[in-house]
Amino acid sequence: MSTESMIRDVELAEEALPKKTGGPQGSRRCLFLSLFSFLIVAGATTLFCLLHFGVIGPQREEFPRDLSLISPLAQAVRSSSRTPSDKPVAHVVANPQAEGQLQWLNRRANALLANGVELRDNQLVVPSEGLYLIYSQVLFKGQGCPSTHVLLTHTISRIAVSYQTKVNLLSAIKSPCQRETPEGAEAKPWYEPIYLGGVFQLEKGDRLSAEINRPDYLDFAESGQVYFGIIAL
């Protein structure tokens, strides 16, 4: 084989081999991809560190999560406090000068009759039908215990328009003395409060009374101890 034919075979073999895509342009592309991958990894690592150490992230809540529920409720309370109520309400107190009886008064400090409620014949007259909270408190006071058993009762009664009969709505009985004070022993004072309260459906014109069986034991030493009232709901 001549030298020329050998050179020609080598050239043909080189042409048959696939050409590489390297060179300066391929090197730059690989360098760019490597740099881009490094930046992505570095950025992800930095973000993880910032989140882990609390440098960035969701801000802490300074208010309750249910603030959206509290705000309307607070606004409703504020608006209702600014708006005068037209619901019937009454709060009467005992007359400390009435001896031997429980007499209710509305022309005293911290007493009121509003929106149609009347105090007539020592009874509260309901101005409209509806649900009412009825309440009353009395305070009894004594000195020592007599030989006879002491029973103290407190009752709230209703005389309805539909049936003219007194019916007890709430009632309580208490006995402050368990045994008689021995003769010659010191007669110690005792106190016995009774509170009554409940919700009832009332009709227009119903009459309500709060009564006791032993007015001689009532304690009027402080104001606000004996009272009677209704609140429309």
UniProtKB/Swiss-Prot annotation:
Domain THD: 88-233
Extracellular side: 57-233
MF term (GO), any: identical protein binding
Membrane topology note: Single-pass type II membrane protein
Subunit structure: Homotrimer. Interacts with SPPL2B.
Documented effect of changing E222K: Biologically inactive
Record flagged with keyword Glycoprotein: yes
Organism whose genome encodes this protein: Homo sapiens (Human)
Post-translational note: The soluble form derives from the membrane form by proteolytic processing. The membrane-bound form is further proteolytically processed by SPPL2A or SPPL2B through regulated intramembrane proteolysis producing TNF intracellular domains (ICD1 and ICD2) released in the cytosol and TNF C-domain 1 and C-domain 2 secreted into the extracellular space.
An annotated GO BP: positive regulation of extrinsic apoptotic signaling pathway
CDD domains: TNF
Keyword field contains Nucleotide-binding: no
GO cellular component, one term: extracellular region
Disorder named in the UniProt entry: Psoriatic arthritis: An inflammatory, seronegative arthritis associated with psoriasis. It is a heterogeneous disorder ranging from a mild, non-destructive disease to a severe, progressive, erosive arthropathy.
Record family assignment: Belongs to the tumor necrosis factor family.
Name of the molecule in the record: Tumor necrosis factor
Disulfide partners: C145-C177
Mutagenesis or variant effect for V167 to A/D: Biologically inactive
